[in-house]
Amino acid sequence: MTDTRDVVIVGSGGANIASLTGALERLGADAALSTDADEIRGARAVILPGVGAAADAMTRLHSFGLDALLPALAQPVLGICLGMQLLAAGSEEDDAECLGVVPGRARRLPASPDLPVPHMGWNRVRKDGGSVLLRDVPDGAHFYFIHSYALPLADTTTGRTEYGSEFTAVFESGNFFATQFHPERSSAHGATVLRNFLEHAL
């Protein structure tokens, strides 16, 4: 890692990035929020966070021309929470069409009296094959989630979680990585995930 600004966080709207920026700075990375295509294109690593509705986030990305830019990026990209779902083909939420980096559509989690939706709080992540992001993370480690939609299991899944049914907690596909949980809110294991991404990217 260098002292120059290496990480650009995409301003996808609705996300409080203070905790994410702080977590990256503690790991020695200089990160900045941006919706500027040239700045994003020139970054050594890109993070796509997000909370809220997929359709609203896609509208915001489209307004900056980022819906075409992001899938074409060649540097490492990390999607977090809604950012993970935006990297998929689409979402059942408002029938949104997303960036299409990986196949599949985010589905609403099944609700029950014992398992309310949104899924909020700590849950286990089981490793599913080799994973860059989960290197040095124990199998079954707990991470912090807050979401109502999730991607089904797929060939790109490298970490899975169960909440009513199993869903993809981590995927890795080429230079694209994603977590449904919030690593910046997930204590030491979350810091390890972010460090693994930064070490891979920088």
Predicted regions and their residues:
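Short, low-complexity, intrinsically disordered N-terminal peptides in bacterial proteins
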Residues: 1-8, 26-28, 199-202
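N-terminal beta1-alpha1 ligand-phosphate binding loop
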Residues: 7-29, 183-185
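Short gly/ser/thr-rich secondary-structure transition/capping motifs
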Residues: 26-33, 59-62, 122-128, 160-162
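Short acidic low-complexity segments
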Residues: 31-42
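Structural alpha-helical scaffold elements that stabilize or flank donor/cofactor-binding regions
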Residues: 39-40, 69, 170
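Short acidic/histidine-rich motifs immediately flanking catalytic phosphotransfer sites
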Residues: 40-50
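Cysteine-nucleophile active-site neighborhood
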Residues: 51-120
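Amide-donor transfer/coupling interface in amidating biosynthetic enzymes
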Residues: 72, 105-202
